[in-house]
Regions:
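Active-site catalytic loop in hydrolytic enzyme cores
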Residues: 1-63, 72, 77-84, 150-155, ...
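Short, basic/aromatic-enriched C-terminal tail that caps enzymatic domains
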Residues: 138, 146-169
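CN hydrolase (nitrilase-like) catalytic-core segments centered on the catalytic cysteine
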Residues: 53-136
């Protein structure tokens, strides 16, 4: 995934969790870094598709990020899971979450319905693109509202301490 700024800065994230059912493990090497991008006062974490199924990888330790962005090829048969997990990531991480999914049919005849959305840290749906349509979803994300909510509901202070050990280490 890439994050490009109007100022010409470029950031990238290599997908950590390769989708073995799609043979990604045979063709790609999993990423091992989880860079948090600072942009205009926001801390942003980029993740890709199947990473969504692994909540520990996206765990917002000490509120290190404010916005979690997933880009995906999430197919129609598992679309309900996409919706549930995106909302769960917003709630458990007390973070805004943006999920960007494709539409159409790929070369393997797998259909995609879209379902691009933006969730608030309280799990409220702020914006969405209609299924099977190209489009843009816009919402106003307020960093002061996020910080105030984190102060009033500091669940992150009670989270379990852990460290991630990658399988290839």
């Amino acid at each position: 995934a890439f994050f490009l700024t109007p100022e010409g800065e470029a950031y990238y994230y290599d997908k950590r969790h390769l989708f073995r059912m799609g043979q990604e493990t045979e063709h790609f090497t999993a990423g091992s870094q989880r860079p948090v991008i600072s942009y205009r006062g926001w801390n942003i974490l980029l993740l890709v598709c199947y990473d969504l199924r692994f909540p520990v990888w996206s765990r917002n330790v000490n509120n290190e990020y404010d916005l979690l962005i997933y880009v995906a090829n999430w197919p129609v048969p598992r679309r309900r899971v996409w919706d549930i997990l995106l909302q769960a990531r917003a709630l458990e991480n007390i973070s805004y979450v943006c999920g960007v999914n494709r539409i159409g049919t790929d070369g393997n005849q797998i259909p995609y319905s879209g379902g691009s959305v933006i969730y608030s840290p309280k799990g409220d749906l702020l914006a969405s693109v209609p299924d099977y349509e190209e489009g843009t979803a816009t919402a106003t994300l307020d960093l002061s509202v996020l910080r105030e909510f984190r102060q009033k509901f500091p669940a992150w202070k009670d989270a379990d301490a852990f460290s991630i050990r990658l399988w290839n280490e």
